Design a protein with these regions (language model features):
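Short connector loops/turns at beta-strand edges and beta->alpha or beta->beta junctions
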Residues: 3, 76-78, 170-176
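GHKL/Histidine-kinase-like ATPase module
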Residues: 57, 85, 96, 103-105, ...
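GHKL-type ATPase core
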Residues: 4-141
Length: 236
């Protein structure tokens, strides 16, 4: 039996994906077969599932190399192609979609190395994604074709009540804002309370600075949220 849950206790959701303990279980249910290799406690373990059912229970198949640990998951999605009775009628994986998502993860987890290989064609595609610098490097990548208004990326990191924040800001000479929000590596396409709070804070801080400097009275300047975010690239 695949156990994907157990993260509710001990503060696990501070760092986990929060898929309600169904991640690999759902992948298994929607696969023709799924193989697991686990290196742990000096041993290599193996289990196999077909159409969601266990066909080879977890067993030790060998020794692990000194210090070797980790998990390898291999699966074949359940298919209706070529007369199959599976789930999916189209198994044309998008390399670009996978590459973009894995690149996000490589930026968000500074120093990690992710390799993506596509062996479906005569000319294989093999990409290694590895970045140092975290969200700062992410922002520089997003703005690589734009003219920055600041020499350095503004990076803010903090921790409060067990919640960690990692924020990078950089303004460029465009009129558009690019704001990417993530929670535990999961993209928040529609933002969230942390995005709303950030926008409100940015507007308040800029307005407060203009007022305290006297520039607002002198030039009769009133800054809106849209003004503060014009040309801003942000990863939160």
């Amino acid at each position: 039996v695949l156990h994907a849950g157990g993260k509710f206790g001990g503060g696990g959701y501070k760092v986990s994906g929060g898929l309600h303990g169904v991640g690999v279980s759902v992948v298994n249910a929607l696969s023709e077969w799924l193989d697991l290799n686990i290196w742990r406690d000096g041993k290599e373990h193996y289990a196999r599932f077909e159409h969601g059912d266990t066909v080879e229970h977890l067993r030790v198949v060998g020794d692990a190399a000194p210090g070797e640990k980790g998990t390898e998951v291999r699966f074949l999605a359940s298919s209706k192609v070529d007369g199959g009775t599976g789930t999916f009628s189209n198994l044309d994986y998008s390399f670009k979609t996978l590459e973009n998502r894995l690149r996000e993860l490589a930026f968000l987890n500074s120093g990690v190395v992710i390799r993506l290989a596509d062996l479906r064609h005569a000319e294989p595609i093999d990409v290694t994604l590895h970045y140092e610098g975290g969200v700062e490097a992410f922002v520089r990548h997003l703005d690589k074709s734009k003219q920055p208004l600041l020499k350095d990326v503004i990076v803010i990191r903090g921790k409060k009540e067990g919640i960690e924040l990692d924020l990078a800001l950089w303004w460029n000479d465009s009129y558009h804002e690019t704001m990417l929000c993530f929670t535990n590596n999961i993209p928040q396409r529609d933002g969230g309370t942390h995005l709303s709070a950030f926008r409100a804070s940015l507007t308040r801080v800029m307005g407060g600075y203009i007022e305290s400097s006297g520039a607002g009275k002198k030039e009769k300047v009133s800054v809106s949220g849209e003004d503060a975010r014009e040309g801003l690239t942000c990863v939160l």
